[in-house]
Regions:
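Acidic, small-residue rich beta-repeat scaffolds with periodic aromatic anchors
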Residues: 1-9, 16, 86-144
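Flexible low-complexity loop/turn motifs enriched in small/helix-breaking residues
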Residues: 1-36, 40-41, 55, 65-67, ...
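A short, amphipathic edge element
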Residues: 22-30, 77-86
Length: 144
């Protein structure tokens, strides 16, 4: 669990002082607000994109709870490598987080396009993201 600070929606870190390779973590355009803990004030979830300069691009769900009027990142959950996030939603009644994404079929090469619809449901319990359910639909037709 590494702590990083985003500046202007991203974090850049060279692997070594003389290295041209760098890790870039950036805030994706997906930001959703709602009630995640039953307390006053809007909490938020955001998607972070972690590109280490290699072949992988890792997507993370970050939970920001409102504490003393300020949003604080309390937990982060890996969603997947080179997936396509379609939507993120917060259910104020259940305090649940729903993520809809396209992933690859199990056993498919990482070079294959994500085409399997997945719905992931999470709850925030004691400042941790707890996976509740993951449902998979049949592959979508990407030829249309």
């Amino acid at each position: 669990n590494e702590i990083i600070q985003l500046t202007e929606a991203e974090h850049r870190q060279a692997y070594a002082d003389d290295s041209a390779m760098e890790r870039v973590v950036r805030l994706a355009e997906i930001v959703e607000q709602g009630d995640l803990d039953g307390r006053d004030g809007k909490d938020a979830v955001v998607v972070l994109v972690d590109d280490g300069g290699g072949s992988g691009t890792f997507y993370h769900l970050a939970v920001l709870l409102r504490r003393d009027g300020t949003l604080e990142n309390v937990a982060t959950q890996l969603l997947g490598d080179r997936i396509l996030i379609q939507s993120v939603a917060i259910d104020d009644a259940s305090h649940g987080i729903t993520v809809h994404a396209l992933v690859r079929e199990e056993g498919a090469p990482m070079s294959a396009e994500p085409e399997v619809q997945v719905t992931m449901l999470y709850l925030v319990i004691d400042d941790r993201i707890s996976p509740v359910r993951r449902s998979v639909s049949s592959p979508v037709d990407t030829t249309r």
